[in-house]
Amino acid sequence: MDKKTQAVTEIYAKSLVEVALERDSVPIIYDEVRAILSVLDDQQVQDFLASKAIDLSAKSEVVRLFQESCSNYMKQFLEIILQNERQQLLYLIMKEVLKELSLKTHIFDIEVTTAVALSDDQKERLTALVEKKFALTKRNLIEKIDDEIIGGFIIKANNKVIDTSIRSQLQELKMNLK
């Protein structure tokens, strides 16, 4: 993404986040953004909105479909995007909104990768560790199973990583032996 596109997406995202914070509607906006992103995660939808060959009115119709089940704040926000002909940036803007919401509220998704599934007790202890270590609050715990890490875990939250996996320890040992 070029600097101009990044700047535009940040401006739009920050404006929606500001409204969400002022109006105490962060959970609603968060849920709506996640719902919109669940549709926009489809590359075909992104390509449709970005295509110069497709008429602007057709793109607007697709974006207006999101408005049917959204709060007034999101409806107005989407309308501004349509008026400014920024439909092609909708996916990037929504991703940036999630990032900004997390930064402002210190509430993040925590991704945990383990070799085997975690018990409920382990999840609770891990969540407490991450919240304390990273000074954040958990929104969702996203669990991934990867038997290639052999043992231990890899935690990712707020662009930070704790890697205690056996695989990484073996790789580190290998590097030290060279």
UniProtKB/Swiss-Prot annotation:
Molecular function per GO: proton-transporting ATP synthase activity, rotational mechanism
Alphabetized Pfam families for the sequence: OSCP
Main location: membrane
Topology in the lipid bilayer: Peripheral membrane protein
Cellular location(s): Cell membrane
Coiled-coil features, chain-numbered ranges: none
Recorded GO CC terms: plasma membrane; proton-transporting ATP synthase complex
KW Transport (keyword) present: yes
PANTHER family the UniProt entry points to: ATP SYNTHASE DELTA CHAIN
Protein family (similarity comment): Belongs to the ATPase delta chain family.
Subunit and partners: F-type ATPases have 2 components, F(1) - the catalytic core - and F(0) - the membrane proton channel. F(1) has five subunits: alpha(3), beta(3), gamma(1), delta(1), epsilon(1). F(0) has three main subunits: a(1), b(2) and c(10-14). The alpha and beta chains form an alternating ring which encloses part of the gamma chain. F(1) is attached to F(0) by a central stalk formed by the gamma and epsilon chains, while a peripheral stalk is formed by the delta and b chains.
Name of the protein: ATP synthase subunit delta
